[in-house]
Amino acid sequence: MNLRAGVDLGGTKIQAVVVDERFSVLGQERRATPTKGKPADVAAEIAAAVRGAAEIADAEPSELSSIGVGSPGDVDDENGTVTSARNLPNWEGSFPLAGALQDELGPPVSLGNDVNVATMAEATLGAGTPYQSMLGVFWGTGVGGGIVLDGKLWLGRDAAGEIGHMVVKVGGAKCPCGRHGCMEAYAGRGAMEARARELVKKGEQTDLFAIMEKRGRERLTSGIWARALVRQDPMAVRLVERALEALGAGVASAVNLLDVEAVILGGGLGVRLGDPYRKRLEHAMLPHIFADHRPPRVLLAQLGDLGGAIGAALLASQSETARA
């Protein structure tokens, strides 16, 4: 049996899977993304996650035919590097991630943009399979986008799909990218947490950080936001409403430009909050869609939390074919 591993490297979690030739998941492992240290520490956690997934699949890492990694930041698969992964600790410069993992685990390693590989997974194996054009929107630590046109991933000049950095308010809130008014400055989980901390310093009350401490977390994960919403925590409700307003305007603007058939909502928050918030995104988009008599389908990512990792395994398979 030909086995491959795929890794989704996120701001709060590292998700690894081992799949067979049909991309059925035989083993998986999830680990927390380090909040301190250097890129080498993140690479060590990735390697540990792959080992864990391989063990569950009753395989050794050396028996894998290849490994794919979907990473944030500026990904250079040809040189095996990731640069400026701002949602990861101290990852401003370039780090040879592919080489570090290959030295540690053995099989060849391919790198891809995290959102692009997740988008291709949904287009090839998930909710996007009936469509020739779609926009993947991945709502998590940041807000990422992937574009499929005529059945193919569209990369532009290698930076297409950065939907989180579409401006939804001129001169608005500062984004982690350093610019102002980006959708991610309102809807990214990292920015939402930063805003929650600011409000607490000003004296506002919330259960968010009490839930975080009870769960033994250092960050406000998607699960913590979901629990706070169940409790109808006023701050959580207000910040999620603010995020949905920004998402609705930004995603609708992208739809006006591309006229895609479908929007696929994924990412940690998108998947965790689920169908009720898919419907709310759809509602938030409608006032901004020009062709509102035929809006695109808005669908929840079918592959769920594993979509990014499965997409990375799909990338590894494509790289094997290219090398053959």
Residue ranges of model-derived segments:
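Short hydrophobic alpha-helix segments
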Residues: 29-31, 86, 157
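Short beta-strand segments
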Residues: 8, 68-72, 112, 136-142, ...
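ATP-binding/phosphotransfer module of carbohydrate and carboxylate kinases, centering on a glycine-rich
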Residues: 1-66, 76-81, 99-109, 121-131, ...
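Active-site nucleophile and cofactor-binding loops and adjacent substrate-binding regions
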Residues: 87-90, 110-116, 136-139, 299-306
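A charged helix-plus-loop insertion that forms the helical arch/lid used to bind
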Residues: 80-94
